[in-house]
Amino acid sequence: MGSLIIENANLFIGVDEEVIANGAVWVSDGFIKFSGAVSDLPAGGENIERYDALGKFVMPGMTESHVHLSYNNSHPQQLNSEPLPIAMLDAVDNARILLGSGFTSAISFGSAQGLDVPLRDAINAGRIPGPRLAASDRDLGSTGSNADGTFGGDSSKKIIADGPWAIRKAIRSLAKRRCDIVKIFLDGEALSEFAPPGVLTYSDEEVAAAVEEAHIRGMRVVTHSRSAAAVKQAVRHGVDVIGHANYLDDEAVDMLEAKRDQIFVCPAIAWEITLLDRGSELGLPRDAMEQRGYQKEVDETISAVKRLRDSKVRVLVGGDYGLNITPHGTNSKDLEYFVDLFGMSTSEALLCATRDGGAAADTSGMVGTLEEGKYADLVIVDGNPLEDIRILQDHSRIVGVMKDGVMHCALMQKNPYIAPDE
C-alpha cells in the first residue's frame, strides 16, 4: 500500500467539530500515521509521495448504518425479485456506488438470498470495491410479523421462527453462514396488513433468546422497532442498534439515555418522507399515506430524535435506501434531514455519519475518525459540507474516497473500469 501524505487540506478529523486549516494526513500501509496541522508533521516524511489537496475538505469516511445492498432500486413489492445471479450483480454495483458516495462502512439491516456474506468476503479480499460491511442475511420475524409478507416476501427474504428454541436454531444457522448481524422485527409497519407499529410481534422470552444466542456466537442484533413498546423491548434485552424508534414515550427515552454508551439508534426517516412526497409513483398517493399515519410518523420521529439528541443518545445516518424512490447513491440525503428536520448543526450531522457511525460499525474502534492508528478511510470533498451539507449529495464533489489506504476515484461512473472523462 505504501505511504502518502495529503496536505493543504481543510481537515475534519471527526473527534469533535474542529476543522484544521492547512491540515495534513499521513497514510502508511493502510493506517493513519498522523493527522493534524502541516506544521506538526513528524520528521521522516520528506521523501514520501505527497498529494496537494488545494484546500479541499478531507474528512473520515461515513457509515451507512441501515443498509440494504440487495435492494435493486425497484418498487417495494418487487424488491429482490430477480434471479440470484442478477441480484448478486446488483449488489456488487450497489456496493461500488455506496463507496463512491463517501460511505466507507455499512451495517446491514437485512439481505435477501444470503447475498451479504459473499459480498462482504469479496470486498474484504479486494476483488470488488465496496464499504466495510457488517453482513446480515434474511430478516428474522414471527408468523404474521412485518417480515412475513408486508411486501409480498418469500423465503428468500425472510426467516420465520416462533418460540425461543426455533429462534435459537435460526440464529445458529445465521452463525453457520458467518453473518455479523442478526436483523429482527419487533413490531411492524403502517402498511402492514398484520402488524402495524405498536403491535409487538415477539415476546420478551423470544427476544431474550435471540439476543443471548446471537451474542454468544459473536453476532450483533439490530431491530426494526418503530413503537415505544418495541424500543423498550429492544433496550431491555440488550440489542445493539435500534432501527427507526419513531414513537418514544418518556420511559423509552430514559431507558435509551441510561444505555447510551451501549445502544445506537438509526431513525431511517428517508422512507417515510419520500413515501409521502413520491408515493404516488408507487400507487400510494399522499392523502392515503397520511391516513395510514405516515405524516404523524414523520412528526413523531422529528420529536423523538430531538429528545435523543438532548439525552446524548447516539443517532446514526442511513436507512432503507435502494427503492426506486430512494435509490442507492442518494444516502447523503440523510444528513440534510438531520440538519433541516432534526435541528442539528452541519458538524453535528457529520459526526453522526462519521464518528458515531464508525463506533457502531466497528466495535474495535478502528473507523469513524482520522486519528493515528486507525484505518485510513477518508473522503476528499471539493467544497465544505460544514457550510452546505448538501454538497455531499453531489457526486462530482466527491473527488476521492480512500479505504484501507487505497484511493478510489470515478466510482460513480456507469463503467468505473474505464478512464474517467476529462
Please tell me what each predicted stretch does.
Residues 1-44, 58, 385-389, 406:
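N-terminal metal-binding scaffold of metallo-dependent hydrolase/deaminase domains
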Residues 76-89, 150-169, 220-222:
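Active-site mouth loops of central-metabolism enzymes
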Residues 39-59, 84-85:
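Active-site metal-binding motif and surrounding structural segment of the metallo-beta-lactamase
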Residues 56-125, 143, 205, 237:
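Metal-associated gating/positioning segment near the N- to mid-region
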Residues 90-116, 130-139, 179-192, 220, ...:
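Divalent metal-dependent hydrolysis catalytic cores, especially in the metallo-beta-lactamase
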